């Protein structure tokens, strides 16, 4: 970042106008690709130690604009992912360098702005589980909402114009955006069919977080009492860049327009949580209040941000009757009845008391579906072998299966009931045994009889054993009876991931 500042050497009012020239700087591509400055393919002459590649980058950008990328189909994208075999790698690097460049104005302002530290409501993803346990037992309703997206790519460019006023950079951004004919890839980059979608998730994260930053700067202002929890998909771009600056601007410009609906936000018990492309509003209010929130949110997105939001994307759930799905947990609030005997002089009587309890359950059906998709079992949950791992050594096979189970057990350690985890352990253990038997061209029974069932026990360490290693043995039994949240694992996206 100091390199960026030394290069720009501009007033804050002029920094926006000089983003595009950075695309022609050699160190931009070194930072984007983690390459050395003297070994990049963008150097015009070998051994020439300058940091400009103006002619090469300019020539490639002209070539990109001249190509008719609408002629390529989804089937051609694998063989010709960009615009031809000659410019494939160069175009890829220009796109990644452009993403690094367009983040610079936001990064510079984030370093200069220090008011953001004052907020006590901006929290990380690790706060979600303690938040659920502490707050949900006192709440009644939850609005489960899918974050809407723009109905046209140009809306995203126009929104970005207010922060990056460099026309050339916006033209280049518009060009890259129109290469993605599947707009859903912006919200869920894993579903994109383009070759560079997996290699350029930084672009998706930047646009997505900027999209979130815009609406939260107004929405979170209206709910100062909310528990704002940051998204998992924060990537390299901090979401809350201009939170306090935009609040002051909002007070001056929009306060009068919202006087009619400000009464809606007087509920002191409403909480805001965002995660994985969704957000929830949890309240202690009534069903009528939540329906008013639902109606307002639809108009809020469509009128002020031109985002397509349907009422069907917002679900009102009563916590006592419905179990919302939060980051792999089914969360619910249950009444735990209890009877207390009271005695006064010679008379005794029973007092009924119902205590709300927050329960978290591992959803076994989605878990089995994920294991089935990763080829560890069939759709009914019957374990099968993993043929693609059969060529590995015994220790590697066991280590991969064991790592998956330990991660799942670690992540779901806060569950109120461990029955689902025992079934997952059974599926993975038997799948591991069948994979080893397939490798040695034997049956599972014969293989375990020859090597012993203790071979798998070492790698499928139970959660109690892991917990006993974390706390002293004298206190582990007492603490283990309570729900424990491990906050060192943020999320598990792919069960078969071992890289």
Swiss-Prot record:
GO terms for molecular function: RNA binding. It comes from the Eukaryota. The keyword Plastid applies. The keyword RNA-binding applies. Keywords: Chloroplast, mRNA processing, Plastid, RNA-binding, tRNA processing. Pfam families: Intron_maturas2, MatK_N. Usually encoded in the trnK tRNA gene intron. Probably assists in splicing its own and other chloroplast group II introns. Belongs to the intron maturase 2 family. MatK subfamily. This is Maturase K. The gene is matK.
């Amino acid at each position: 970042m100091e390199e960026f500042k030394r290069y720009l050497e501009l007033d804050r009012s002029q920094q926006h106008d000089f983003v595009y020239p950075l695309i022609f700087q050699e160190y931009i591509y070194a930072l984007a690709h983690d390459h050395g400055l003297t070994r990049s393919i963008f150097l015009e002459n070998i051994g020439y130690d300058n940091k400009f590649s103006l002619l090469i980058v300019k020539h490639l950008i002209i070539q990109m604009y001249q190509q008719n990328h609408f002629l390529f189909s989804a089937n051609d994208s694998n063989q010709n992912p960009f615009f031809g075999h000659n410019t494939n790698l160069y175009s890829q690097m220009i796109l990644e360098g452009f993403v690094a460049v367009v983040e610079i104005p936001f990064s510079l302002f984030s370093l200069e702005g220090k008011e953001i530290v004052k907020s006590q409501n901006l929290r990380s993803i690790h706060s979600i589980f303690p938040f659920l346990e502490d707050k949900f037992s006192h709440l009644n309703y939850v609005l489960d909402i899918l974050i809407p997206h723009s109905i046209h790519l140009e809306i995203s460019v126009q929104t970005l114009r207010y922060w990056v006023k460099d026309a050339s950079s916006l033209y280049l951004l518009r060009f890259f955006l129109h290469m993605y004919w599947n707009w859903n890839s912006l919200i869920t980059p894993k579903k994109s069919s383009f070759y560079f979608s997996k290699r350029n998730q930084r672009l998706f994260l930047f646009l997505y977080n900027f999209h979130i930053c815009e609406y939260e700067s107004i929405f979170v202002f209206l709910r100062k009492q909310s528990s704002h929890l940051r998204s998992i998909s924060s990537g390299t771009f901090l979401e809350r860049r201009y939170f306090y600056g935009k609040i002051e601007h909002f007070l001056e410009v929009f306060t009068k327009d919202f006087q009619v609906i400000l009464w809606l936000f007087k509920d002191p018990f409403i909480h805001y949580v965002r995660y994985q492309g969704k957000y929830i509003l949890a309240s202690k209010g009534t069903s009528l209040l939540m329906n008013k929130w639902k109606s307002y949110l639809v108009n809020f997105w469509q009128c002020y941000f031109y985002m397509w939001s349907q009422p069907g994307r917002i679900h009102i759930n009563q916590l006592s009757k419905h179990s919302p799905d939060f980051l792999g947990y089914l969360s619910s609030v249950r009444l735990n009845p209890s009877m207390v005997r009271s005695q006064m002089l010679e008379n005794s009587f029973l007092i009924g008391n119902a205590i709300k309890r927050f329960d978290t359950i591992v959803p076994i059906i989605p878990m089995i579906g994920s294991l089935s998709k990763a080829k560890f079992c069939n759709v009914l949950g019957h374990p099968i072998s993993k043929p693609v791992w059969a060529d590995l050594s015994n220790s590697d096979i066991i280590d991969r299966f064991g790592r998956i189970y330990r991660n799942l057990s670690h992540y779901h350690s806060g569950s109120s009931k461990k029955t689902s985890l025992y079934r997952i352990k059974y599926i993975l253990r038997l799948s591991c045994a069948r994979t080893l038997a397939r490798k040695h061209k034997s049956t599972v029974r014969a293989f375990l009889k020859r090597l012993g069932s203790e071979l798998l026990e070492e790698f499928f360490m139970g959660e109690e054993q892991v917990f006993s290693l974390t706390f002293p043995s004298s206190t582990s039994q007492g603490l283990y009876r309570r729900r424990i949240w491990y906050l060192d694992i943020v999320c598990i996206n792919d069960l078969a991931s071992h890289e």
